[in-house]
Regions:
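Histidine/acidic-residue-rich, glycine-tolerant segments that coordinate divalent metal ions
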Residues: 125-137, 143-144, 160-278, 283-289
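Divalent metal-coordination and catalytic microenvironments
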Residues: 52, 73, 91, 103, ...
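N-terminal secretory signal peptides that target proteins for export/translocation
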Residues: 1-7
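Bacterial N-terminal signal peptides
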Residues: 11-26
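Signal peptide processing junction and immediate N-terminal pro/mature segment
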Residues: 24-30, 448
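Metal-dependent amide/peptide-bond hydrolase catalytic core
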Residues: 249-457
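Acidic/His- and Gly-rich active-site-bordering loop/insert found
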Residues: 30-138, 143-151, 155-165
Length: 457
């Protein structure tokens, strides 16, 4: 692990030089008040980032991470509550009457052994919930999110004349297992604390260069449902299949037939994916087993499409079992799910214009929705109009070279994922402060005008 003095040296000798030398990063001779405010907290935000990066913790085990964030927010004057929904953190800063706006960060890291070669790379190893020895890494950039949120929190606390209302900061555990948001809600997140008028969340991406942010009006992330099917047959000798009911063959037929649900039952233009990640059965090549297991991930955006896919999978599984003469119908279990993240279109358009006015023309990029999932959707389902946006963290030159050669930079969840930290933090804090100051004005009714429901669209 690096000492704090060494962390400081890295910031000054490495990150600051990197910020000045990266193509596409402009350093203005004249700084705005917000630029100066961001610069004033940047060294401490970098220290926090490097510390978090070296001390990653797995989902639902973020005890050190949560305590570190809570202590720092408490020092800034926030009213902090810990252990919400497990290791969750809620920090409230009241600044007179006005709207309530929520800003969320995730706390957890991934069971990935870091291979970036960075001087501050994680060397943490631990046991996961199944007892396996695993490396641990912030391979999804949640350390960038936390450090940005802390810097934003500091600027908002030190410049209370620029906004009014209630700022609600959320440190959410277990995003990677899509369980943390729901646990916080069940633990009274919106009953023990003010229910926000607007919710904000940011996620980093190596698909955009530093200095740019991405927005997606409407559906941004997909419904995600995990389905496990146990197919029951009748085992026997592989040389005498006529005495058996082969569950492997039934599973194979299910695997093929379910694809027709997408291609023949879902309207063209409605996104839908059924992927089978595993079929497991048997112990020996000449033994037909008694059963087989299949694992599915099912993705969609629209609620009706989601229900059609899930019902169709169960229908196909039972039909194929009946066709094979199975005496026992398959067991179909949905064991892990989260809904789509929906960005309020009116709010998104408003904040996109606001961000471009501060970050510069061309800095806001409209992105297509993607089929990955995010349990921030649980907050949206509670009736919180939201804006979920992406933060570019890629070296502009490396990204351009990769695109020119038809390659992609190491993405989130890769052991090589390495955001360009200082400019990413700077843009992240600038974007978050800009959004919060824009929304934390007027009355709750005023801020609701920026949402689809109140705009009547």
């Amino acid at each position: 692990m690096l000492s704090l003095s060494r962390l400081r040296a890295l910031q000054i000798a490495g990150f600051s030089v990197l910020l000045l030398s990266l193509p596409g990063i402009r350093v203005s001779a004249q700084s705005s008040p917000l630029d100066k405010q961001v610069s004033s907290v940047l060294p401490d935000a970098q220290t926090l980032y490097l510390d978090l990066h070296q001390h990653p913790e797995l989902s639902s085990h973020e005890t050190r991470t949560a305590a570190e964030l809570a202590d720092r927010l408490r020092t800034l004057g926030y009213e902090v509550t810990e252990h919400v929904g497990g290791t969750g953190v809620v920090a409230i800063l009241k600044n007179g009457p006005g709207p309530t706006v929520m800003l969320r960060t995730e706390l957890d890291a991934l069971p990935v052994e870091e291979k970036t070669g960075l001087p501050y790379a994680s060397k943490v190893r631990t046991k996961d919930d199944s007892g396996r020895d695993v490396g641990v890494m912030h391979a999804c950039g949640h350390d960038i999110h936390m450090a940005s949120l802390w810097g934003t929190a500091a600027i908002m606390a030190r410049n209370k004349d620029s906004w009014h209302g209630t700022l609600m900061l959320i440190g959410q555990p277990a995003e990677e297992t899509i369980t943390g948001a729901n646990k916080m809600i069940k633990d009274g997140l919106f009953t023990r604390f003010p229910k926000p008028d607007i919710g904000i969340a940011m996620h980093d991406t190596n698909g955009l260069p530093v200095g740019k942010v991405g927005i997606t009006p409407g559906y941004a992330k997909a419904n995600a449902d995990s389905v496990r099917i146990t197919v029951y047959g009748k085992g026997g000798h592989g040389a005498q299949p006529q005495t058996t009911v082969d569950p492997v063959l039934i599973a194979a037929r299910i695997a093929v037939t379910v694809q027709s649900i997408v291609s023949r039952e879902i309207k063209p233009g409605d996104a839908a994916v059924i992927t089978i990640g595993y079929i497991q059965a048997g112990t020996k090549n000449n033994i037909i087993p008694d059963d087989a297991q299949m694992g599915f991930t099912v993705r969609s955006y629209k609620p009706d499409v989601r229900q059609h896919l899930l019902a169709g999978i169960e229908r196909v599984a039972k039909a194929e079992a009946m066709a094979a003469g199975a005496e026992k119908m398959p067991l179909v279990e949905k064991y892990e799910s989260t809904s789509a993240v929906f960005n309020d279109p009116v709010l998104t358009r408003h904040l996109a214009a606001t961000l471009e006015g501060v970050l510069g023309k061309g800095s806001v990029v409209t992105e297509d929705p993607i089929m990955t999932s995010e349990d921030y959707s649980y907050f949206v389902e509670q009736g919180v109009p939201s804006f979920y946006f992406t933060l570019g963290v890629a070296d502009p030159q490396k990204l351009a070279e990769a695109k020119a050669s038809g390659r992609q930079l190491p993405s989130n969840h890769s052991p090589l994922f390495a955001p360009v930290a200082e400019p990413s933090l700077k843009t992240g804090m600038t974007a978050e402060v800009t959004i919060l100051r824009d929304l934390l004005q007027g009355t709750p009714a005023d801020v609701k005008k920026f949402t689809q429901q109140q705009a009547g669209n």
